[in-house]
Amino acid sequence: MEAKASARYIRVTPMKARRVVNLIRGQQANEALAILKFAPQAASEPVFKVLESAVANARQKADREGLAFKPEDLVVSAAFVDEGPTMKRFQPRAQGRAFRINKRTSHVTVVVATPEKEEVR
């Protein structure tokens, strides 16, 4: 079973958000939540919320389909960050000049899944 959650237009640069997402990819969901809770990066809070939402979506999906749900079985199967729109601002400088400031945004997507049981032959 697979569940997905995403957050769009997060005010964190994609490069900084990718550093956080790389920490949790492939981890168990409970471990990933613990890692994010204590990660010092500012991007860890929105990623934590997205991962919590993905776990909640998995619980809802399991209830709908009548499947047994154990949160400790979930694994972060995919996690990625895409670049959102950039807000452009101007910083006034001396002698009538202006420097452009790019305020970048991110779209964070996290997919959790229960690993498939491999058949032993």
UniProtKB/Swiss-Prot annotation:
SUPFAM superfamilies: Ribosomal protein L22. GO terms for biological process: translation. Keywords: Ribonucleoprotein, Ribosomal protein, RNA-binding, rRNA-binding. GO terms for cellular component: cytosolic large ribosomal subunit. The keyword rRNA-binding applies. PROSITE patterns: RIBOSOMAL_L22 (PS00464). CDD domains: Ribosomal_L22. GO terms for molecular function: rRNA binding; structural constituent of ribosome. PANTHER family: CHLOROPLAST 50S RIBOSOMAL PROTEIN L22-RELATED, LARGE RIBOSOMAL SUBUNIT PROTEIN UL22M. This protein binds specifically to 23S rRNA; its binding is stimulated by other ribosomal proteins, e.g. L4, L17, and L20. It is important during the early stages of 50S assembly. It makes multiple contacts with different domains of the 23S rRNA in the assembled 50S subunit and ribosome. The globular domain of the protein is located near the polypeptide exit tunnel on the outside of the subunit, while an extended beta-hairpin is found that lines the wall of the exit tunnel in the center of the 70S ribosome. Belongs to the universal ribosomal protein uL22 family. Part of the 50S ribosomal subunit. This is Large ribosomal subunit protein uL22. It comes from Kocuria rhizophila (strain ATCC 9341 / DSM 348 / NBRC 103217 / DC2201).
